């Protein structure tokens, strides 16, 4: 019997990537609005470029937020603190263009007087479809290529912030991992790409010599630490700063915008995406809250041993609390003789996917032990401190489906 063999690739970017700088500022602004007023309605977009930050969007809130202070704090935490970066927390301009939300939208989302059931009083903030996914490739029940890619850039940031080794590192970085699969199982890492911003070569050191130092350091201190040795072999291709010099980066090298890294934020291309970004959006926006809830459903189904893979789609109409549709696909991996229809029937009963129920279940308007800014770099999923990663519905699912 012939084996099925294929390659699959996912990428990630560091917290210093310009689009991620934007995401983190947007979510930090959201965090402060939510802290002051848990019922805030926020749609916050951020634009960053050479020496400039613009924060705009629509807000309905009782809170008052100092956008300048928040933006500079985030930029400082990321590490853009030197004038030579041409984007510096202390000297960049910060313009706030936040304004009030359309009352037409607000009327459809908050309907307190009209409806008796409080969980039906919050309608979806917009129409759209959202996806959740889980698989058995990693302990976090996430796709392996994405997890490795996220860990590579996260490790780079940790090394940079510790400041003990590789002191030439600057905040902007990207990673990409290609895995080889045989019969649906990860066999090996076929290729790794790491591009990191760095200081100019020291005086008397050629560009080629400097890149050789950087390549050696990244292989030893990043790739070999993150990627299991059993998955690396002599055929694995390692591309470190493949274009060579990477001194100019961050918002000076490329303009950043909120919501442009939606595949990095989710499943690395292993699952569909409804198209709606997360950062800067309060939890009444189902682009965010329903994507979190869909991951929760998929993860509990896989954690319960009902399937090895699970994709969940949910869709909404603006102003309507109940989902328009729910769809579950286990990609032929369902176990115990179960069908997708049987799993879906029970899941629809066990998981309440009305926006108000999602917000209440995960504490999305009163985060405890986490904040939205944390989600804005290194992925919204596969990180155990987020409440939508809990697997507390496993036993209920198994009981409902008569699975031991």
From Swiss-Prot:
GO terms for biological process: one-carbon metabolic process; S-adenosylmethionine biosynthetic process. It catalyses: L-methionine + ATP + H2O = S-adenosyl-L-methionine + phosphate + diphosphate. Mg(2+) binds at residue 19. Belongs to the AdoMet synthase family. K(+) binds at residue 45. It comes from the Bacteria. GO terms for molecular function: ATP binding; magnesium ion binding; methionine adenosyltransferase activity. Homotetramer; dimer of dimers. ATP binds at residues 17, 172-174, 245-246, 254, 260-261, 277, 281. Residues 101-111 are annotated as: Flexible loop. It is found in: Cytoplasm. Its EC number is 2.5.1.6. It comes from Chlorobium phaeobacteroides (strain DSM 266 / SMG 266 / 2430). Residues 1-13 have a biased composition (Polar residues). This is S-adenosylmethionine synthase. PROSITE patterns: ADOMET_SYNTHASE_1 (PS00376), ADOMET_SYNTHASE_2 (PS00377). Binds 2 divalent ions per subunit. Pathway: Amino-acid biosynthesis; S-adenosyl-L-methionine biosynthesis; S-adenosyl-L-methionine from L-methionine: step 1/1. Keywords: ATP-binding, Cytoplasm, Magnesium, Metal-binding, Nucleotide-binding, One-carbon metabolism, Potassium, Transferase. InterPro entries: ADOMET_SYNTHASE_CS, S-AdoMet_synt_C, S-AdoMet_synt_central, S-AdoMet_synt_N, S-AdoMet_synthetase, S-AdoMet_synthetase_sfam. It is an enzyme of class 2 (transferase). L-methionine binds at residues 58, 101, 254, 285.
């Amino acid at each position: 019997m012939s084996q099925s063999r294929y390659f699959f690739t996912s990428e990630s970017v560091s917290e210093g990537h310009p689009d991620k700088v934007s995401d983190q500022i947007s979510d930090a602004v959201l965090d402060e609005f939510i802290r002051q007023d848990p019922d805030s309605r926020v749609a916050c977009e951020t634009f960053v470029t050479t020496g400039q930050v613009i924060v705009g969007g629509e807000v309905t809130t009782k809170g008052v937020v100092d956008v300048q202070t928040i933006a500079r704090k985030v930029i400082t935490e990321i590490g853009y603190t030197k004038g030579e970066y041409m984007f510096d927390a202390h000297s960049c301009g910060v313009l706030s263009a936040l304004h009030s939300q359309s009352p037409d939208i607000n009327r459809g989302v908050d309907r307190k007087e009209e409806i008796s059931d409080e969980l039906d009083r919050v309608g979806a903030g917009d129409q759209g479809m959202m996806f959740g996914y889980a698989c058995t490739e990693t302990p976090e029940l996430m796709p392996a290529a994405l997890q490795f890619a996220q860990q590579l850039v996260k490790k780079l940031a940790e090394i940079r912030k510790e400041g003990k080794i590789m002191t030439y590192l600057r905040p902007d970085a990207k990673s990409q991992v290609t895995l080889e699969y045989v019969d649906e199982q990860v066999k090996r890492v076929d290729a790794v790409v790491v591009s990191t911003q760095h200081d100019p070569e020291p005086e008397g050191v050629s560009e080629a010599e400097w890149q050789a130092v950087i390549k050696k350091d990244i292989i030893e201190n990043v790739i070999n630490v993150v990627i299991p040795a059993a998955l690396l072999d002599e055929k694995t291709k390692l591309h470190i700063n493949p274009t060579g010099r990477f001194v100019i980066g961050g918002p000076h090298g490329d303009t950043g915008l909120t919501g442009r890294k939606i595949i990095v934020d989710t499943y690395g291309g292993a699952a569909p995406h409804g198209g709606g970004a997360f950062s800067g959006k309060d939890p009444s926006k189902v682009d965010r809250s329903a994507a979190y809830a869909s991951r929760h459903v998929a993860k509990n189904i896989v954690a319960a041993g009902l399937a090895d893979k699970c994709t969940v789609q949910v869709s909404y109409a603006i102003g309507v609390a109940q989902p328009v549709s729910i769809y579950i696909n286990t990609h032929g991996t369902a176990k115990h003789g179960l069908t997708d229809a049987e799993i879906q029937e029970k899941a629809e009963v066990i998981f309440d996917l009305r926006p108000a129920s999602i917000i209440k279940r995960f504490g999305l308007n009163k985060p405890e032990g986490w904040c939205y800014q944390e989600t804005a770099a290194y992925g919204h999923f596969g990180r155990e401190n987020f409440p939508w990663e809990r697997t507390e519905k496993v036993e209920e699912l198994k009981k409902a489906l008569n699975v031991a």
